[in-house]
Amino acid sequence: MTKSAMITICGRPNVGKSTLTNALVGEKIAIVSNKPQTTRNRITAIVNRGDTQFVLMDTPGFHKPRTRLGDYMVQVVRESVADVDAVLLMVEPVAAIGPQEEALIERLRESGAPAILLINKIDTVDKTRLLDVIALYSAAYDFDAVIPISAKTGEGLDELFTELEKYAVEGPHLFPDDMITDQPERQICAELVREKLLTCLDKEIPHGTAVEVTKFSERDDGIIDLEVTIYCEKDSHKGIIIGKKGAMLKKIGELARMDIDEFMGTKVYLQTWVKVKENWRDSMAQLRNFGYGER
């Protein structure tokens, strides 16, 4: 008998949610960087193990919003905690509960969904420190399970799947068995470009960028022609993104193309353009245009 489980992954920015998503799927479908608010939309990942299909929802980092884009991202998290079979609250191995975790725990109380505490990054600390973290969070909320993991090394992931199996419901799979994400190829390509913006640029500049695919076509020989436009909020930011004699934009494009080649499994010719849209993060029309619509 086939079974399915809908699972939401939530937590503060940079706690490792997207790294975990990629590790569970076994392929890179969610972009990763060391900067907060890397994930902007909910990303659905599909993992099949035996007769069970796990539908994992990677959500934006829960934070105090400063723009309408931030408002949208926080709302995505709030909605994703409801009407699922289980919620994974991912935290760092630190014996302190921050305001983001407090707000998410309160949302768990409201939703009533089964909740599993994931203590990530255990490869970076002495395991004896985990006892204090477990005691602190167990006093704050009655979690159904507590699982220490390392999304980076894979430690604890088999135990996580064993626990998630308990919440699977008998019935047909929700997605085809050969599907690993519901994201369109164009969207993943745009996100891979945005990941390189986050990697190569400093401070606020990458957070004020959006990427739009303006051309996606396949030749008879399988080569893909891809054109993307990078939008930023200021002319000064545009100059930094392009760089001296176009050096920065070339670097971003080359790094992105390598990942896109690997993801698409074929040669990709990538062209990048940079345009300015002032204050797009506070414009509902522009947010909808870039796929961050009202919920």
What would you call each of these model-derived segments?
Residues 114, 123-181, 185:
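Canonical P-loop GTPase G-domain recognition
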Residues 16, 156, 248:
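Conserved glycine(s) of the Walker
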Residues 58, 120, 150:
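Active-site glycine-centered loops adjacent to acidic/histidine catalytic or metal-binding residues
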Residues 27, 46-50, 65, 80, ...:
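Conserved, well-folded catalytic cores of nucleic-acid-processing
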Residues 185-295:
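P-loop NTP-binding site
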Residues 48, 53, 75-146, 217-220:
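Conserved C-terminal guanine-recognition region of P-loop GTPase G domains, centered on the G4
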Residues 39, 63-64, 96-97, 125-126, ...:
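Catalytic P-loop NTPase motifs of RecA-like helicase/translocase cores
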Residues 1-83, 91:
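Conserved G1/Walker A P-loop phosphate-binding module
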